């Protein structure tokens, strides 16, 4: 889980901030800065990264041997830095229950339309994960709608949905967020609006059945191979509560998206250009799709590692 990595970074972050702070009410004495700087070396930063990324930890999947070893390592490191246990019952750990879902995706995902049919091949053209923590994710005869970036951001006067009813639809979305203006979505800085997690959540709030995010290396910051590897196995998340959920969380290559959009009677380049405006409105695609994904669902327990550094005030 992400928190296991960020926890280890806390002491380093504190150390770095102590060195950088040289003004204001929290001045760091020169002798403390000297000691801190001496301890920040390439070796000190490299060692924990090498260990946590090593094959010995077997990927650190939740509730695995590697997960246990990683937690023990983090606790030992925090203790060596002077932290006190910040977990449950005086220990270092905070228990977290998680749900693992392994989706049995079809080798071909088919779409039918007036301008032709399109078959997307698993891994080559599309990859997906289940949006539900149940034995199957099902989409039946759903229409497709291009919704630009799939963003609702009142503070930027941006709404890609414009009140259009997309319930039960499969939404085709662009990755990232509008980034061509420094005053709009912080320019090139990727905000939460640009993350795939937000896009799936946004679609769920609209009542959509599923999402296909169009992958490009520039918009994602990584090549298609990263999507293939990171979405190709068991996916872990917190247990679902009452929040709305989509059935399927999918990605498609740019080439696959172009074929889909063309079969739906549209041109992807023109849709992308239209999506770069606040006046954009969702564009229905003349396509239908059905898909059933069998899921293997497991419930396991892991933990965060927490340390407390007592203050002097």
Please report, for each region that a protein language model flagged, where it lies by residue:
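N-terminal hydrophobic or amphipathic helices/low-complexity stretches enriched
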Residues: 23-86, 310
């Amino acid at each position: 889980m992400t928190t296991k990595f960020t926890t280890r970074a806390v002491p380093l972050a504190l150390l770095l901030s102590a060195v950088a702070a040289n003004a204001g009410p929290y001045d760091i004495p020169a002798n403390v800065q000297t000691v801190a700087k001496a301890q920040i070396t390439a070796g000190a930063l490299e060692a924990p990264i090498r260990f946590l990324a090593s094959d010995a930890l077997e990927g650190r999947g939740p509730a695995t041997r590697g997960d246990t070893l990683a937690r023990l390592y983090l606790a030992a490191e925090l203790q060596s830095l002077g932290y006190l246990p910040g977990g449950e019952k005086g220990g270092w750990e905070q228990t977290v229950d998680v749900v693992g879902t392994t989706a049995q995706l079809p080798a071909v995902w088919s779409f039918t339309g007036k301008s032709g049919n399109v078959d997307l091949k698993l891994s080559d053209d599309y990859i997906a994960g289940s949006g539900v923590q149940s034995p199957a994710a099902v989409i039946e005869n759903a229409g497709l709608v291009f919704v630009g970036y799939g963003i609702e951001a009142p503070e930027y006067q941006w709404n890609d949905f414009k009140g259009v009813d997309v319930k039960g639809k499969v939404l085709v979305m662009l990755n990232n967020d509008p980034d061509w203006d420094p005053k709009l979505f912080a320019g090139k800085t990727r905000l939460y609006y640009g993350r795939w997690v937000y896009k799936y959540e946004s679609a769920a709030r609209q009542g959509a059945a599923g999402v296909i995010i169009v992958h490009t290396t520039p918009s994602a910051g990584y090549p298609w191979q990263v999507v293939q590897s990171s979405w190709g196995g068991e996916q872990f998340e917190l247990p679902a509560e009452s929040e709305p959920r989509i059935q399927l969380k999918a990605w498609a290559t740019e080439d696959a998206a172009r074929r889909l959009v063309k079969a739906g009677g549209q041109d992807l380049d023109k849709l992308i250009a239209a999506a770069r405006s606040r006046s954009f409105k969702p564009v229905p695609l003349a396509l239908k799709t059905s898909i059933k994904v069998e899921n293997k669902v497991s419930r396991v327990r892991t933990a965060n590692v927490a340390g407390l550094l007592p203050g002097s005030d």
